[in-house]
Amino acid sequence: MWFFARDPVRDFPFELNPEPPEGGPPGPWVLHRGRKKATGSAVSIFVYDVKPGAEEQTQVAKAAFKRLKTLRHPNILAYIDGLETEKCLHIVTEAVTPLGTYLKARAEAGGLKEQELSWGLHQIVKALSFLVNDCNLIHNNVCMAAVFVDKAGEWKLGGLDYMYSAQGNGGGPPNKGIPELEQYDPPELADSSSRAVKEKWSADMWRLGCLIWEVFNGSLPRATALRNPGKIPKSLVTHYCELVGANPKVRPNPARFLQNCRAPGGFMSNRFVETNLFLEEIQIKEPAEKQKFFQELSKSLDSFPEDFCRHKVLPQLLTAFEFGNAGAVVLTPLFKVGKFLSAEEYQQKIIPVVVKMFSSTDRAMRVRLLQQMEQFIQYLDEPTVNTQIFPHVTHGFLDTNPAIREQTVKSMLLLAPKLSETNLNVELLKHFARLQAKDDQGPIRCNTTVCLGKIGSYLSASTRHRVLTSAFSRATKDPFAPSRVAGVLGFAATHNLYSMDDCAHKILPVLCGLTVDPEKSVRDQAFKTIRSFLSKLESVSEDPTQLAEIEKDVHAASSPGTGGAAASWAGWAVTGVSSLTSKLIRTHPTPVPSEAAVPQRPVPEGDPAPAPAPASATPATSGHRETQEEDKDAAEDSATADRWDDEDWGSLEQEAESVLAQQDDWSTKGQGNRAGQVSHSDHKSLDSHWSSWEVEGSWDQGWQEPSSVEPPPEGTRLASEYNWGGAEPSDKGDPFAALSVRPSTQPRPDPDSWGEDNWEGLEAESRQVKAELARKKREERRREMEAKRAEKKATKGPMKLGARKLD
């Protein structure tokens, strides 16, 4: 029934590649590359074909098959599967390359570093120590041909064909019969009459010396060449000479050889070896030791081999995060190693971990992720961003830690191109509205405006029309000077998104109000922006046919490609905002925008004007000092231009307490003295007045000037609440009620929404409601007091204590 027989080679779950076999070690085995049929993973397959009349070689091959199958050690070639038939033997191992082939390929690419060679030899000596000291086995075949290298650059000891027991069980060493291998035998084996006392490891340590010579000098031509160390490093020569000494008694045990080489200043005493040893024992290390190791690992990765980082360090980092609770310290080395991966490998190994990290509640990890988002954002697809990352990132907008809130705002610059229409035009802008209106940190309000200016091109046309003008108008009324500058620059950066009607009726009136701003930097930018808008209007006035061309982007769909114009603005503007506002936080805290302290509000006619606060005295010699510091700050701002991601955003968290501690002093003075220094950024050329807008003067300039006016009295309506375009009067008691922006019948808007009206209406309306309630209470109190006084007057005659005379 021969047709029922099955070919075991055909059913073997591994197959040999059709490529020519690699140059394997001298001996019975031929090394092939192969793969697993089920998964396609790469393996190495050692093949021995049984030949008639070669029974001795067949027995050697079968012994090697048995030894490799039963021996398990990290530094010995890893056995995966095997096949034994009457015609052949197959041994499947991890994918490896012969050491000779590996060294030749690396030499062509620039050669191996000494630290790589030290770790490779460390592994081979450790494998010999395991065989001799733990298993009582003599390898009997240590040479270049018996060493293999895996994909991580790890050296593995193979060539177990001629291994025998050190205790004498099963006879002596087998006969090799191969001249290429016999040249590595120690001299005492050639002299049969020699009675020199030797240790069980003496022969293998001699062969180890031959291996060391070959690693540094190439193939060993003859045994006498061992007398010349050649290129062997000086730190290893002393220990090498002990290995190739004629007296077998003085050859050290493999364990002692390792100890000698690991001594301070020794050949195997370096950062690379220490890192590998720690990774081998990382599972039994204490959490504090792991934290320290990962913190220091990032500094060393640049000097480590790329294959080692990809195939050994990366799996340990992923395991440490997945099961070891390593936390945020893993992120820096993880992203550093990720640079060595292809796009496909990054998607398979890094992205799943990153997505899981975003759901973490660890603040340190969230900040690190936001800070390093630029390194992995390109590998994230839109569905992953919208469903698994953005919902977790938005929690940062509501975090009590200012540093996390600001980093979250910053990350939107990278996430915006990948966000869906709903997440971008609704969810994100809802958070931006809350931050710009209510956040107590001036720099966060400022950078929210900056971020909105850059992502404006990604918004839909209807959202742009509804949001941008209101948002930037609100920013121009912020008590924090850099926020006002950001609002002006926001108008400039998004100039192509406004119709001519909006420019004339909405934007220019807002900008004109800033021409009398106390801060010179705000005034300067306002004048430049006004001139640009006026030149645009003038060109349309002279040639109305240009209107369609100028307004071509107003109703266009969101176009990420147009973000380049805003990118130049955001690049330097964000740098200026982050650097200068961080200085402000450290030295001059800003007040929280509140109902009681809103600077630069017009006082209604008829109310008494508050007395101006005295300006702080300035020494006569301060002008020269400020000029020098201006030049210094200008150099710093120029050097740090376009480095949004390099800014120290964490400074907000460090200085939050000082900001809050000094707010009470601001509120009690009513009009805070502003003191600061002037810093100028580099002047940049204007491309048709729109490509970029340099900041002339620091945002902390002008704190020496007093606030213009005090807050208006309670119940007073603000000028911003009147519609100066004219409307029918609805309240006879208020002569300006006819000019109100909102009819009284309209409901109040959601404070987190981006309504059609200007953003300042949110705060003004809140103050209006409170003022109305206070007025009603005062009116009720007045009527009660009048009733009591009338009752007292109605009583007649003198009154006694505790009684009243009856009529």
Curated annotation (Swiss-Prot):
Coiled-coil segments on the chain, per record: 756-796
Superkingdom of origin: Eukaryota
Gene3D superfamilies according to UniProt: Leucine-rich Repeat Variant, Phosphorylase Kinase, domain 1, Transferase(Phosphotransferase) domain 1
UniProt feature, compositional bias: Acidic residues: 644-656, 753-763
A GO biological-process term: retrograde vesicle-mediated transport, Golgi to endoplasmic reticulum
Biased composition (Basic and acidic residues): 764-774, 781-794
Alphabetical UniProt keywords: Coiled coil, Cytoplasm, Cytoskeleton, ER-Golgi transport, Golgi apparatus, Phosphoprotein, Repeat, Transport
Primary localization: cytoplasm
Cell compartments where the protein resides: Cytoplasm, Cytoskeleton, Microtubule organizing center, Centrosome; Cytoplasm; Endoplasmic reticulum-Golgi intermediate compartment; Golgi apparatus, cis-Golgi network
HEAT repeat placement: 350-388, 389-427, 507-545
Biased composition (Pro residues): 601-613
Ranges of biased composition (kind: Polar residues): 660-679
CDD domains: PK_SCY1_like
Pfam families in UniProt: Pkinase
Function text: Regulates COPI-mediated retrograde protein traffic at the interface between the Golgi apparatus and the endoplasmic reticulum. Involved in the maintenance of the Golgi apparatus morphology.
UniProt record similarity statement: Belongs to the protein kinase superfamily.
UniProt name for this protein: N-terminal kinase-like protein
Organism for this UniProt entry: Rattus norvegicus (Rat)
